Amino acid sequence: DWDDYVGRLAIGRLFNGRVRKGEEIAICRLDGAFAPAKVSVLYGYEGLRRIEVAEAGPGDIVAVAGLEEVQIGETLSDREDPRPLPPIHVDEPTITMVLSINDSPFSGREGRHVTSRKLKERLERERLVNVSIRVEPTESADAFRVSGRGELQLAILIEMMRREGYELSVGKPQAITRAQDGVVREPMEMLAIDCPEEFIGVVTQKMGERRGRMMKMSNHGSGRVRMEFRVPSRGLIGFRTEFLTDTRGTGIMNHLFDGWEPWQGDIEHRATGTLVADRQGRATAYSIENLQPRGALFLSPGDEVYEGMVIGEHARGNDLDVNVTKEKKLSNMRASGSDDMIRLIPPRLMNLEQALEFIRDDELVEVTPAAVRLRKRVLAANRRK
């Protein structure tokens, strides 16, 4: 953990002996080396509250300050008689995405932290607290590659940053691959699903589309069935929300990292293109009504748009630049009652997870405290063609 006043905290359970504030101890490194250290502050726990204590004994869960270089899995031991315990291993990250500053025309309107320096500080602070998160620089000083154990973990981090007042752009999540013996391998997950019997068909169909293989299925006659699948980590991107919708909120799913396997093949993404705003302004009901036959729209009348912003899903496979700010021309010719006949279909609203699954490599998710928007990586239409 991390504390703004005392720095990094090593949290663990005391197996034997006693530890006291100010005591000289040894850190047993994972490579077998020993490093001297001192307990500057010692904390215990009282329920969910962390309290400072003078000493602790066997079985106590404590947090030790003053150990800036300690890593998970290392042992804190007596300096005169160091005895390392078996190390704890943390699963390797399986999903990565690039987080960058928000450079859209709406940048700085809705957030308090908008610079790359603020973004880097926040990600570094998260790396100190969350041992399963990795933060790496990219070729751009304004972008950082963040890796974690899954799309949900990274989405939670982005949602936390959004609520803290950060503005950022997020690229498409990708699986981390590795080359072994000349073969590209990808991370696999063991997925356990518990759902009512009537949803077996839709769940197995969705798993098949995501390169999942059923390993086991059991039905104990209670009306619910348990299924186990082996599926690529990238196959689970966006699946949780889809699964809850398909099972009407009655399904339960959990997954664990289950090794590496050769690349399982391409997973079909959306076959449709997008509707892209070609100018800045406010969406009008007149334009939205005329664009409804072209596809599903993501916005309502009065919403602000900018050039390059994705405003809908095209019914065809290509991207289409459209003018959603066009207003109806006034004239002296009127048909009785015709001005009141605008019929609008409710917009399709997306949460952060759905947006991350929807985008392609040439698109980004713009995340601000007030909104989640989709946009093209290159905003100007003449530069995209």
Map each language-model feature to its residues:
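Short glycine/threonine-rich beta-strand-turn micro-motifs
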Residues: 138-153
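Acidic, low-complexity intrinsically disordered tails
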Residues: 371-373, 379-385
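A short, contiguous, amphipathic alpha-helix enriched in charged residues
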Residues: 27-29, 104-128, 341, 345-347
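Residue-level signature of catalytic and energy-coupling elements of molecular machines
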Residues: 22, 59, 73, 99, ...
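Contiguous effector/interaction surfaces
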Residues: 190-206, 210-213, 226-340
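Phosphate-interacting basic helix/loop segments used at nucleotide- and nucleic-acid interfaces
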Residues: 8, 116-142, 198-202, 210, ...
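Conserved nucleotide-binding/hydrolysis modules and their immediate coupling elements
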Residues: 1-97, 107-109, 272, 279-331, ...
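Interdomain boundary/hinge elements
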Residues: 31-42, 53-57, 84-102, 130-142, ...
